[in-house]
A protein has these predicted regions:
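Core catalytic alpha/beta fold that binds nucleotide/phospho-ligands
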Residues: 1-123
């Protein structure tokens, strides 16, 4: 397959933590119930949430789009049976991907207590 786009994003975990604390409704606005359920048992879910937010941003960048091109719930991070993260694309985000000939997504996410990073390749 041909690479159609590459996106990478980094999120400052402390800054993201402050935003979540300042606006508690942000969790439901940004993340799907599946994502919130995944991070719920974690002692500190914020780095994992920051990585999932970075994944959304990286998808936008891989498609050459800016913030607001599609809703936050139209792209989310799921887990494959192996435990590997994978992308779920729906709604307007899926329409935009199809328009660009994108049918395959590759995702890598990582985080520390300081930074969360997502790298996306669109084919």
């Amino acid at each position: 397959m041909t690479v159609k786009g590459i996106g990478i994003d980094a999120v400052d975990v402390a800054r993201f933590r402050t935003s979540l604390a300042r606006t508690p409704s942000m969790r439901q606005r940004l993340f799907t119930p599946e994502e919130l359920e995944y991070v719920a048992p974690k002692i500190d879910p914020v780095p994992s949430l920051a990585a999932r937010f970075a994944a959304r941003e990286a998808v936008m960048k891989a498609m050459g789009l800016g913030l607001g091109a599609f809703g936050f719930h139209e792209v989310w991070v799921s887990r494959a049976p192996s435990g590997a993260p994978s992308l779920r694309i729906t709604g307007r985000a899926l329409e935009l991907a199809v328009d660009r000939g994108i049918t395959v997504w590759h995702l890598s996410i990582t985080h520390t207590d300081l930074v969360a990073i997502a790298h996306v390749v669109a084919e």
